Curated annotation (Swiss-Prot):
Expressed predominantly in the heart and in the skeletal muscle. Belongs to the popeye family. The chain crosses the membrane at residues 37-57, 77-97. This is Popeye domain-containing protein 2. It is a multi-pass membrane protein. Glycans are attached at N4. One of its GO terms (cellular component) is membrane. Keywords: Cell membrane, Glycoprotein, Membrane, Phosphoprotein, Transmembrane, Transmembrane helix. GO terms for biological process: heart development; regulation of heart rate; regulation of membrane potential; skeletal muscle tissue development; striated muscle cell differentiation. It comes from the Eukaryota. Important for the maintenance of cardiac function. Plays a regulatory function in heart rate dynamics mediated, at least in part, through cAMP-binding and, probably, by increasing cell surface expression of the potassium channel KCNK2 and enhancing current density. The gene is POPDC2. One of its GO terms (molecular function) is cAMP binding. It is found in: Membrane; Cell membrane, Sarcolemma.
Length: 364
């Protein structure tokens, strides 16, 4: 060991081993190769940084091959440069393959950026969800029905990608479904995995629509196996159902001029055609609800008394116009639950139809 170290020291002290230095510089290919290698080693991290790195290194080593073949005339220079260039090209090919493997169709990529990326869902987890629906995008033509009440079985869960879907029951409009909303989330949550049922509403496409659909059994298996995906779907479905409930609540406000509690049972019977079919009976019930809120008139002399505004009109063909009344205070939720839904419930039973939800529920 000491002999080798002393020999290296002698070589360093003696100076360069080159007998004669070349007077002319190397050709342009040699300098180009070194410039490309310098740029390549300045590459950053990440996928695009790797593309930058291996791209410049491949070009630099190929220039070294040309320089070793035409100028240096060294077989070892050619072989080593060629080997390094091949390794860099293989790395580039591997990166391209990985990118193509991770690429999703346009619809699913937009769905990921809109729905899952804000929740920081990993891309690999999203791919498992997409694989469950077989990466198929289904379509609906205008006025084509997705489900018919009382006929279509509940055997899938669908998410609308584009278009608009109308939800109705007995021909009465309930609400719309817009892109990136579930089309049948209430039906999905209403059944256990071992139960079967049919739709209680009709879903009709108002425009050309596209959607994705998960088979019920396949999705249940995925949710059972992956707890993270199960929690994700639970959050998405809960938010979707709450949005539909608030939509119905807003429609009630627009129709009756007061806001209903969304926890009231059988909101459909207030929205549905049964409330309109009640006619005078429903108006009479409304008056009965509102009358207790009006303060009784004060006692006045007989000569100064006027005809009360709510007196019974005479039985003539020309009915007087109803008197205008000030907007009353909002009635209690128990009164609303006992008046309007019960009238609709009796009419639905007389028609032989089952209500959407039980109308007799304990007071909260």
């Amino acid at each position: 060991m000491s002999a080798n170290s002393s020999r290296v020291g002698q070589l360093l002290l003696q100076g360069s081993a080159c007998i004669r230095w070349k007077q002319d510089v190397e050709g342009a290919v040699y300098h180009l190769a070194n410039c490309l290698l310098l740029l390549g080693f300045m590459g950053g991290s990440g996928v695009y940084g790797c593309f930058y790195l291996f791209g410049f290194l491949s070009a630099g080593y190929l220039c070294c091959v040309l320089w070793g073949w035409f100028s240096a005339c060294g077989l070892d220079i050619v072989l080593w440069s060629f080997l390094l260039a091949v390794v860099c090209l293989l790395q580039l090919a591997h990166l391209v393959y990985r990118l193509r493997e991770d690429t999703l169709p346009e619809e699913f990529d937009l769905l990921y950026k809109t729905l899952c990326l804000p929740l920081q869902v990993p891309l690999q987890t999203y791919k498992e969800i997409v694989h469950c629906c077989e990466e198929q995008v289904l379509t609906l033509a205008t006025e084509q029905t997705y489900a018919v009440e009382g006929e279509t079985p509940i055997n899938r869960l669908s998410l609308l990608l584009s278009g608009r879907v109308r939800v109705s029951q007995d021909g009465q409009f309930l609400h719309y479904i817009f892109p990136y909303q579930f089309m049948d989330s209430p039906e999905w949550e209403s059944l256990q995995p071992s139960e079967e049922g049919v739709f209680q509403v009709t879903l009709t496409a108002e425009t050309s629509c596209s959607y994705i659909s998960w088979p019920r059994k396949s999705l249940h298996l995925l949710l059972t196996k992956e707890r993270y995906i199960s929690c994700l779907f639970s959050a998405l479905l809960g938010y979707d159902i709450s949005e539909k409930l608030y939509t119905l609540n807003d429609k009630l406000f627009a129709k009756f001029g007061l806001r209903f509690d969304i926890r009231l049972p059988s909101l459909y019977h207030v929205l549905g055609p049964t409330a309109a079919d009640a006619g005078p009976e429903s108006e009479k019930g409304d008056e009965e609800v509102c009358e207790p809120a009006v303060s009784p008139p004060q006692a006045t002399p007989t000569s100064l008394q006027q005809t009360p505004p709510c007196s019974t009109p005479p039985a003539t063909t020309n009915f007087p116009a109803p008197p205008t009344r000030a907007r009353l205070s909002r009635p209690d939720s128990g009164i609303l639950a006992s008046r309007i839904p019960l009238q609709s419930y009796s009419q639905v039973i007389s028609r032989g139809q089952a209500p959407l939800a039980p109308t007799h529920t304990p007071e909260l």
